[in-house]
Amino acid sequence: MNMEQLYQERLTRYVTALRNEKPDKIPIRPFVAEFTAQYAGLTCQQVAHDYTLAFEAAVKCAREFDWDAVVANMVYVWTGLTQAAGLRYYGIPGIGIPPTVGFNYIEPPEDQAFMRA
């Protein structure tokens, strides 16, 4: 099967499932952002800051694991914008947390929490 035929087969499968109809088999489209980075030999920080690297990592996994579809990159963000907005509790890979760790909530000390019981 050539690339175009494979694409059409997967597209049909995916769209059929989205229409709540019965595809030939269950389409696979995992949400595995941090995994794709690690599998491609990259850090979470690299894929969070470089969309091209993130996309290449997603494509590598899609090809090697035979996925039907893939999210181009769920972890790419404009980190400067999030920092400028003053998001104090948002851990960005390589900024406040290790580069190998995915995005995290940074819990403040209880006496500094903005939400209290």
Stretches found by the model and what they are:
Residues 1-117:
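Catalytic cores of TIM-barrel enzymes
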